[in-house]
């Protein structure tokens, strides 16, 4: 009996480890595993949030992006993996005008967000989420996290860990087609 229970526990741990290894693995293929480890993309209620851009002070948020699919990237300057997402985001923004990109810098102030944007040459509209409220509302468990929203701002999929250019393109295309 003990052997069977131990074998079952080990099998469950191995399956969980395999799912975790898939999160953040970006080989350029279409997303197959959502952040939950499920094979189906996430879907849910319409996402809404807004704030002031850390660079310009202008109001930004999903309300200003009605009718357009949106990539929302959630990061922080203290996150070791977050700079890995900068180059793919720059390339994605430069090659794309049909999908909006909005950044949320979480659990730090606007000054830290501006420094990160400057250091990583990112010209993205960015909201400072100092208390982590927006990240919590979005279900963020790990940084960076990227959400792909349909044109009616439903969550089409979510990716935990740095997303490469292939992942950004394929998931954004899927979100655009879904809504």
Residue ranges and their predicted role:
Residues 115-122, 130-179:
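Thiol/disulfide oxidoreductase modules built on the thioredoxin-like
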